[in-house]
Amino acid sequence: MGVSQTLHRISASRNRHGDVCGLTYRVGRHIPGIADSIFDVVAKAASCSSGSLLLVGPPGVGKTTLLRDVTRQLADTFHKLVMVVDPSEEIAGGGDVPHVCMGTARRMLGTPRQSKYEVLEEAVANHGPEVIVVDEIGNAKEVAAIKDIGSRGVTMVATVHGTSLERLLDNSVLSPLVGGKQRMVIGDFAAAQ
């Protein structure tokens, strides 16, 4: 649950009976200009209709903080129609009004019954964005939705948990985000070519 008018979130841990037995408070950060170091990469993603940007890193290293500033750059500097798919209220904060760090980007929360991939599909079907931003891609349905949306010419900007590109490629669910990996056997003649 997002904390209204902030970037912070509170999550409950529950026991097997459904009773709350712990709370986690995540402090969201807005650091204006943090994406300036990758401005050329953001500019390239903004300039091509099939370009996408995937931020990979372990939990807690600042992927979402960077994602917020990339979103602002795409919306305000490059004047793109940016839709932030944010069902967990982690990117743009809690409440009905997105945090000011989003700039002119729009946000979709979805309904409590919708999954993230359903909100992704609704965003492209009903709102015509040039760019869709989403945090923490983690399952096959979300990966399939992202690949489908990207094939329609919408730029995708997303984060995913991982420690390296190599490890991401070894993950059969997430590897399609970076083109995938397939095993091949090549004979001596073909290898010499």
Q: Where does each model-flagged region fall?
A:
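P-loop NTP-binding catalytic core
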Residues: 1-52, 85, 95
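Well-ordered alpha-helical segments embedded in enzymatic catalytic cores
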Residues: 66-69, 115-122, 145
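Glycine- and other small-residue-rich loops at beta-strand/loop junctions that grip anionic moieties
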Residues: 56-59, 109-113, 134-136, 157
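Conserved P-loop NTPase nucleotide-binding/switch module
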Residues: 127-190
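P-loop NTPase nucleotide-binding module
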Residues: 27, 37-88
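Long, charge-dense
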Residues: 23, 27-37, 97, 106-110, ...
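Conserved catalytic network of the ASCE P-loop NTPase/AAA+ motor domain
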Residues: 46-48, 74-77, 99-103, 122-127, ...
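P-loop NTPase switch/communication element
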Residues: 74-123, 169-170
